[in-house]
Amino acid sequence: MAVPKRRTSKRRKRARNTHKVAPAIVIQSCPQCSAAKRPHRVCAECGYYAGEQRVAAQEA
C-alpha cells in the first residue's frame, strides 16, 4: 500500500486547496426598484426581469 514519505506541509496543502473555494455571490441593483438582487433572476421586491413584470409583487 502506498504511504506518503513526508508529511504534507500547511503551505503545500493550502496551495492545493485554493481551487476548492466557493465563488463570491454577485449582487446587482434592480433597475426598476433599486433593490439588491442576483443577476439573471427575477427581483424579489418588484417582480421585474428584463424590463417586464414576470411575477406579481409580494405585499409585505
UniProtKB/Swiss-Prot annotation:
Give the source species.
Gemmatimonas aurantiaca (strain DSM 14586 / JCM 11422 / NBRC 100505 / T-27)
A GO MF annotation of the entry reads:
structural constituent of ribosome
Which UniProt key words apply to this protein? Ribonucleoprotein, Ribosomal protein
Transmembrane annotation, as ranges: none
Q: Which PANTHER family match?
A: 50S RIBOSOMAL PROTEIN L32, LARGE RIBOSOMAL SUBUNIT PROTEIN BL32
Q: What is this protein called?
A: Large ribosomal subunit protein bL32
Q: Which SUPFAM superfamilies does this UniProt record tie to the protein?
A: Zn-binding ribosomal proteins
- Biological processes annotated in GO: translation
Single GO cellular component annotation?
large ribosomal subunit
* Compositional bias (Basic residues): 1-19
Region: Disordered, residue numbers: 1-20
Indicate the family of this protein: Belongs to the bacterial ribosomal protein bL32 family.
UniProt cross-references to HAMAP family, sorted A to Z? Ribosomal_bL32
The cross-references to Pfam families, in alphabetical order and at most eight, read: Ribosomal_L32p
- Keyword check for Acyltransferase, yes or no: no
What InterPro entries is this protein classified in? Ribosomal_bL32 (IPR002677), Ribosomal_bL32_bact (IPR044957), Ribosomal_zn-bd (IPR011332)
